[in-house]
Structures are given as C-alpha cells and as structure tokens.
Amino acid sequence: MKKAVVLLSGGLDSTTCLALAKSQGFACYALSFSYGQRHSAELCAATRIAKHMGAADHKIVTLDIALFGGSALTDASIEVPEFKESPEIPVTYVPARNTIFLAMALGYAESIGARDIFIGASSVDYSHYPDCRPEFIESFQSLANLATKAGIEGDRFTINAPLQYLSKVQTIQLGAELGVDYGLTVSCYQANEAGEACGQCDSCTFRKRGFKSAGVDDPTRYQKCVHI
C-alpha cells in the first residue's frame, strides 16, 4: 500500500484531506504540530480524528514557540480579531508556518518511503495567507524534488493540496460524501479547552457559512453566535 504523510491540524480542511487520502488507497501517516497555538484544543481533536479514521500512525511534533512570534495565534497579547472582509493578511498569520510544517513532513515522508504529502491549503474562502496559495504549493514541490535524495534520483514527491480551489461549501460537501464526522473537528482560532468555538473569528465564520450554504447540519459547539 502506498504511504502518504497528511498534515493534520484537527480542523475541517485537514480532516477532509485525511479522508480523501484514505479514499485514494493511501496508508496515512498523520503529522500534527504543537507550536504554542492558543487553540490547542485542535491537537486533542487531531488525536481523536487520527484514531477514528484509522491513520497508520499519528505523530505530534513540538516546536519552539519562539519560532512563531508576532501572531495572534501564538501571542496572548495580540487579540484574535472578529471576522472582517479584507484583502489584507490578518494578525492571525503565523510566520512561515506551512513552509516549516511541509519541510518537516518532507523529511518524515522520505524517511518512511512516502512520496505523497497532503495539506489542506485552500485559496478560496481563506484569510489571504501567502503560504496557502497555489504558487507556494507548486514552488515547495519543486524544492522537495531538488532537496532530497529521492527527488534527484527520480523518485519524485507530490505535494497534494486537493482543496486548493474548493470553496468551504464544496469542501464540506466532499467531506460529507466521504463520511467525515465534522463533529470531531475544531477549527476556531481561540477554541476553549472543551473545544467550543468562539463563533466570531475568520475561521468560525467561514466554517459556519460553509455548513449553512452546503445544507449540512453544523455540528460545531459555539460559545457565541455570529450572524451570517
């Protein structure tokens, strides 16, 4: 069976990616990161999801919080803003996060003989993070095949971002078709320890709109309601 490393945050998108990779016949090696994020409830969710969905293995890598300063997701002195339509990169951007995550996933993949890496990045219904764009994914794949023994020997890596051009509605519909239990997931940037979502941040808003427009019951437990 082919192996794939799946970046699993515990959120809606990465869980859909895990389900999709499994549906394509991959033995999935889930990889999560603890980097001082205030929404640590997502790591508990990732553990539940990996077990529930039968991942071949699930590793949680702890990174030095000092690597990720200046973000509302890692710095308690910076408030997570309520949702606002804007083309600007918000304070919830974590410096080079996906680059670091993918680099570690690449090393892990090469070491276990996997040549596919799945990431739930999307450039639709997102917060304009630069490391979610298709240009970034394509460039990282090129790097992966230039920087590894496997790559230069022709055993090439593929960075799979199957949600890249899907809206949140389409992602939820896909997950529903794959039987994803979204009640296990946590997407909120500031979920409490019980995994209850704030209902006001960008991630909550995109998620809530997505379920409503997809016509799928929203299993999320919200602390507050947001009008959509």
Curated annotation (Swiss-Prot):
Q: State one molecular function term (GO).
A: zinc ion binding
Required cofactors, per record?
A: Zn(2+)
Top-level taxon in the UniProt lineage: Bacteria
Catalyzes what?
Answer: 7-carboxy-7-deazaguanine + NH4(+) + ATP = 7-cyano-7-deazaguanine + ADP + phosphate + H2O + H(+)
Q: What is its EC number?
A: 6.3.4.20
Q: What class of enzyme is it?
A: ligase
Question: What does the entry give for GO biological process?
Answer: queuosine biosynthetic process
| Similarity comment text for this entry | Belongs to the QueC family.
Q: What is this protein called?
A: 7-cyano-7-deazaguanine synthase
Organism from which the protein derives: Legionella pneumophila (strain Lens)
